[in-house]
């Protein structure tokens, strides 16, 4: 990383930021803790998917295997469906898997269009265009970061510089806006999911309970959160990579009514799913 002898001076239209580089080590250590926290969330989510996979691979419905995908085919931290199951045909049921305390549910990067004077979802980076359209509706008429492209997205800065800027003003704090209670359901339906499994709360349907699990619909007060996200604290040239992210999430997950059914515990599986102790499905098969 390049060294700055004393300080780096940032000028913007409304404020001057001074970064004292004597505190670089302390700033880096703070960020390492933040990075590890984010990594733990991702790892915890993956472990929860595997826990459910280890149960579903032993299950059947209507006399046929309910889940026949391999461990490598789990969605993980990607835009793919977390777990696909079989009802009327192979992989026709999509299930979103969520740890209840995860900070972001459905998220996408956004940018400010100076000609149209509003924020938009970065559609080119989203494999589901209709999801981008839904985010655009949520962002309409929202004032975020003074409705301008943040200067640090136009200029290269180091992570210690960004951390000092963030601590020096509340201008770049997260923004939260209330959104309809159906938003998360609609977003995951567009992704191809029919159900959502939430740790500690259980299984819910998003639109119609097409498998007849007798699950409740996922219904809870929701909000959209807009924040500056650090994707990388240091590239080969010593600069960090930032973006503006929008994500939908429950306002208070504790207010969610628990489901009677869950996929993370064999004793709480829906009544029409049969668990077979000796059954194992290690590779996909065409069963219908």
Where are these regions (language model features)?
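Catalytic cores of nucleic-acid endonucleases
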Residues: 35-43, 96-215, 219-225, 232-240, ...
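Charge-dense, extended regions
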Residues: 264-280, 284-288
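A short, surface-exposed helix-loop junction/capping segment
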Residues: 13, 25-40
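Serine/proline-rich low-complexity intrinsically disordered segments, especially terminal tails, linkers
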Residues: 22, 44, 217, 245, ...
């Amino acid at each position: 990383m390049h060294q700055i002898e004393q300080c780096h001076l940032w000028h913007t239209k409304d404020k001057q930021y001074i970064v004292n580089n004597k505190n670089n080590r302390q700033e880096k250590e703070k960020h390492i803790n933040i990075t590890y926290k984010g990594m733990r969330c991702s790892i915890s989510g993956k472990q929860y998917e595997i826990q459910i996979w280890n149960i579903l691979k032993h299950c059947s419905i209507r006399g046929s295997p309910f889940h026949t995908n391999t461990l490598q085919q789990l969605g993980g931290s990607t835009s793919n469906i977390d777990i696909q199951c079989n009802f009327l045909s192979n992989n026709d049921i999509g299930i979103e898997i969520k740890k209840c305390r995860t900070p972001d549910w459905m998220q996408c990067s956004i940018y400010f269009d100076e000609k149209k004077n509003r924020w938009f979802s970065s559609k080119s980076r989203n494999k589901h265009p209709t999801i981008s359209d839904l985010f655009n509706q949520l962002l309409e008429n929202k004032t975020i970061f003074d409705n301008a492209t943040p200067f640090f997205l136009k200029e290269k800065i180091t992570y210690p510089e960004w951390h000092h800027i963030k601590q020096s003003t509340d201008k770049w704090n997260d923004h939260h806006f209330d959104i309809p209670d159906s938003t998360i359901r609609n977003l995951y339906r567009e992704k191809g999911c029919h159900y959502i499994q939430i740790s500690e709360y259980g299984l819910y349907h998003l639109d119609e309970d097409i498998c007849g699990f007798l699950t409740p619909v996922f219904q809870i007060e929701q909000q959209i959160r807009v924040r500056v996200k650090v994707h990388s604290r240091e590239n080969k040239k010593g600069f960090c990579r930032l973006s503006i992210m929008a994500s939908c999430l429950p306002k208070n997950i504790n207010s969610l009514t628990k489901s009677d059914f869950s996929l993370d515990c064999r004793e709480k599986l829906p009544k029409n799913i049969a668990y077979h102790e000796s059954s194992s499905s290690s590779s996909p098969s065409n069963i219908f």
